[in-house]
Design a protein with these regions (language model features):
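Conserved alpha/beta-hydrolase "acid-adjacent" motif
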Residues: 210-215
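Hydrophobic, aromatic-rich cap/lid helix
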Residues: 165-190
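Short beta-strand/loop motif that positions the catalytic acidic residue
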Residues: 197, 203-205
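Catalytic active-site module of serine/aspartate enzymes centered on a nucleophile-bearing elbow/loop
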Residues: 230-265
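Flexible "cap/lid" loop of the alpha/beta hydrolase fold
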Residues: 107-151
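Conserved alpha/beta-hydrolase "nucleophile elbow" surrounding the catalytic nucleophile
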Residues: 30, 97, 101-103
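Active-site loop/oxyanion-hole signature of alpha/beta-hydrolase fold enzymes
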Residues: 41, 48-51, 58-98
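Conserved HGGG/HGGXW glycine-rich cap/lid loop of the alpha/beta-hydrolase fold
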Residues: 9-68
Length: 265
């Protein structure tokens, strides 16, 4: 798939048209240590969108996949990644689309919506919730960077950091680029700013997603926010799950109503 130079850096992307006329376009933004293939293609999202007549655009965010691999934290941050996403839409001649981010990609997606609200038809945020607004624990940024740069993964102290490191190793990612990405300085997203976004917003997370928190807490910030909690899912198992796909497509179809009941299996 092609690479294009955007904002002076090389960005890899896929642009997949449906078999017939496109009914709509979606921009996909993957999570930390993932990439467009692992986050969206392998998990079945490409064919799922294609079957529904949706043009699918997905990029490897800076430091990930086949895109630029800077080892300087100054080259990362939410604002840079959002600018890359908007520049890709410009390059492809897309004026307006749906935007779907997962985990780290939700932060990029929200920044895209804040920077260019007129270009986002629907905003979908997965693997995120009320913990977005929690202060970062002291040393957490350094801990993630250290986990990515550690010579011996056995020295990593927490299970969450071990999971991200294992995931990065499985994808063959550049760990020094990921360390720089995790150390980037991005100001917190503010409730008041997010509350100005008037497009429909979906916030969805697994019931066992300890990284996200309650999706309802975040959804309440948006004037047209809706939340869904996925039973039986954690942060990593939610993205390929059929329940997440059903939720996203019901949302796009305007049919999303109630959350899954607590006893859903």
């Amino acid at each position: 798939m092609p690479n294009v130079t955007l904002n002076g850096v090389s960005i890899a992307f896929d642009d997949i048209p449906p078999a017939g006329p496109a009914q709509r376009t979606v921009l996909l933004l993957h999570g930390f240590a993932s990439n467009r293939n692992e986050g969206w293609k392998r998990t079945g999202w490409y064919p799922a969108f294609e079957r529904r007549g949706i043009r699918t655009i997905a990029l490897d965010q800076r430091g990930h996949g086949e895109s630029v691999k800077s080892h300087d934290p100054a080259d990362y941050g939410r604002e840079h990644m959002a600018a890359d996403a908007l520049a890709l839409l410009d390059h492809l001649g897309v004026q307006r689309c749906d935007v779907f981010g997962y985990s780290m990609g939700t932060r990029t997606a929200m920044q895209v919506a804040l920077d260019a609200p007129d270009r986002v038809s629907n905003l979908m945020l997965g693997g995120i919730g009320g913990k977005l607004f929690d202060p970062r624990p002291a040393g957490s940024v350094e801990a993630m960077a250290d986990a990515m740069s550690a010579e011996d993964p056995a020295t990593i102290k927490t299970e969450m950091l071990k999971s991200f490191r294992q995931f990065a190793d499985e994808q063959g990612e550049d760990r020094m680029a990921l360390a720089a990405c995790s150390a980037a300085d991005s100001p917190p997203l503010e409730r008041d700013a997010l509350g100005t976004l008037t497009m429909p917003v979906l916030v969805v997370a697994g019931r066992h997603d300890d990284l996200a928190g309650d999706p309802e807490e975040l959804a309440r910030v948006f004037p047209r926010g809706k939340s869904v909690t996925l039973p039986g899912c954690d942060h990593f198992s939610a993205i390929p799950h059929g329940l997440l796909k059903a939720t996203v497509f019901d949302f796009l179809d305007g049919m999303l109503d109630d959350d899954f009941p607590d006893n859903y299996r």
